């Protein structure tokens, strides 16, 4: 896949996640008992045979880069995370963290398109050559995917842009970017979070641009009265400009973890009789030395993902319990997510909740649909 520059946008602060997002970077929110949100997109890039992915972030970027450098770089031969203007410093520190980073000299970005503009010298380069395509990804989407087929179709069609999309229930379309296509698979409409949806297709938020075309539209939009956003500005401008834009349907599981209730619902999906993702489909980056098991039934646990080192003296039902957690004597945990190292006190009864690392509890809206036991 020479010429493809993978770019990972990781600017979220996690404000809509409530206590779960407080004090932590949203990309590093744990997920599935195995990993963090950002690890899914990184693993997908690695799975697709691309040799690196450029991280674009600004909110507590040192903290995020340090984490990813230790977790990912040097662990997979021939693959690494590129930190753009900071990359040379990290390359000189394999397996450890640099003492100091270069001073930030570029302005703060106001949106996803701004991130591409301010770091253009890194975005549009692939190794020592100009990139031919830019693969734009986000850090809070949960899915297992190989981008190879999408890249091949994009190149064969000579499209200026290929957008991923998925079919969902129309009542949820207003939460996403709505897309429509003609009989030839060409994009005819793109509307971010429509009030009155006319389609059941939504933008799955990863896309592949022809690099030269993307750069041209970014330069055209620069200095105008725009929202500095890929979905609200760049894609609509390309559509209005008559560019060839094709769609690529995502038929497998994909989830945008935008709120704590979506986060909780996504965990419930892992426990179904036909899980949305198998444990083996998820990156293993949180305490990778500890085995995990999907336990259908047994003493003190039913239909749950439980790490092997969990100290359980209570009852775990339809829950995901991370490494290092402890469930106290006669405690009952039902339909919950228990984060790494969390303690559930003796005699506690919890349902439809997230137990944070410090033991505090964040309630979630209960779902009508029951998890298969």
UniProtKB/Swiss-Prot annotation:
Catalysed transformations (reactions): valienol 1-phosphate + GTP + H(+) = GDP-valienol + diphosphate
Relate the protein's function as given in its record.
Involved in the biosynthesis of the antifungal agent validamycin A. Catalyzes the conversion of valienol 1-phosphate to GDP-valienol and less effectively to ADP-valienol or other NDP derivatives.
Tell me the superkingdom of the source: Bacteria
Question: Which Pfam families does the record cross-reference, listed alphabetically?
Answer: NTP_transferase
Q: Which cofactor does it need?
A: Mg(2+)
Family listed: Belongs to the bacterial/plant glucose-1-phosphate adenylyltransferase family.
Keywords, sorted A to Z: Antibiotic biosynthesis, GTP-binding, Magnesium, Metal-binding, Nucleotide-binding, Nucleotidyltransferase, Transferase
Instruction: List the GO molecular function terms.
Output: glucose-1-phosphate adenylyltransferase activity; GTP binding; metal ion binding
User: Mind telling me what this protein is named?
Assistant: Valienol-1-phosphate guanylyltransferase
Name the positions where substrate binds.
Answer: 177, 192-193
């Amino acid at each position: 896949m020479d010429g493809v520059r993978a770019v990972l946008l990781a600017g979220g602060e996690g404000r809509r996640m409530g206590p779960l997002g407080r004090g932590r970077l949203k990309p590093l929110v744990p997920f599935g008992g195995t990993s963090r949100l950002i690890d899914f997109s990184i693993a997908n890039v690695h799975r697709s045979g691309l040799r690196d992915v450029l991280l674009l972030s600004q909110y507590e970027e040192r903290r995020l880069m340090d984490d990813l450098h230790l977790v990912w770089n040097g662990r997979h031969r021939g693959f690494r995370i590129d930190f753009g203007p900071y990359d040379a410093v990290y390359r000189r520190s394999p397996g450890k963290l640099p003492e100091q980073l270069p001073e930030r000299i570029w302005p703060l970005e106001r949106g996803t398109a701004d991130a591409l503009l301010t770091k253009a010298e890194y975005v549009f380069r692939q190794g020592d050559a100009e990139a031919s395509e830019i693969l734009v990804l986000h850090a809070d989407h949960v899915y297992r995917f190989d981008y190879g087929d999408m890249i091949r179709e994009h190149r064969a069609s000579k499209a200026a842009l290929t957008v991923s999309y998925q079919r969902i229930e129309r009542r949820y379309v207003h939460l996403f970017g709505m897309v429509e296509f003609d009989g030839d698979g060409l994009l005819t409409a793109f509307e971010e979070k429509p009030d009155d949806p006319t389609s059941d297709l939504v933008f799955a938020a990863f896309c592949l641009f022809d690099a030269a075309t993307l750069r041209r539209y970014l330069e055209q939009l620069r200095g105008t009265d725009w929202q500095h956003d890929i979905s609200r500005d760049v894609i609509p401008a390309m559509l209005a400009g008559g560019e060839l834009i094709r769609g690529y349907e995502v038929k497998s599981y994909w989830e945008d973890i935008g709120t704590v209730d979506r986060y909780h619902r996504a965990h419930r999906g892992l426990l179904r009789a036909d899980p949305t993702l198998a444990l083996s489909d998820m990156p293993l980056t949180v305490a990778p030395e500890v085995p995990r098991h999907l336990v259908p039934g047994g003493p003190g646990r039913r239909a749950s993902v439980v790490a092997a080192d969990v100290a359980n003296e209570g009852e775990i039902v339809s829950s995901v319990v991370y490494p290092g957690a402890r469930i106290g004597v006669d405690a009952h945990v039902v339909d919950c997510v228990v984060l790494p190292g969390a303690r559930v006190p003796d005699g506690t009864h919890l349902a439809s909740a997230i137990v944070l690392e410090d033991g505090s509890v964040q309630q979630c809206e209960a779902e009508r649909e029951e998890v298969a036991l």
